[in-house]
Amino acid sequence: MPFAQRRTDLPVLLVHNIDPRWGAKDREESRVAADALEAALRQEGHPVTPVTVAKADLESLLQPYDPDEFVVFNWCEELPGMPRSESLVPDIYERLGFTYTGANSAALAL
């Protein structure tokens, strides 16, 4: 069911990972896809701030942003250099108080 009114001014943090261990082709494909996603969000009217996670320092990357002012579009599959860390990503969002897209940490820990 469509919403009667859509909010298009909601600031978005587009969080995505690029692991330095990936090959050049995979890193470039990830950048191109993130750029396309950013463009689509902007086309809908959202101010977008891309946050590229290239090390396992997601929490420090998010520190400058107020969780009451941004929603996180979570496209970060894991923390670089930390295999099987997919449940840690939403755990960080939750601890910092961000609203985010995707499954929560408990679901991803299963």
Go through each PLM region and give its residues.
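ATP-binding N-terminal substructure of ATP-dependent carboxylate-amine bond-forming enzymes
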Residues: 1-110
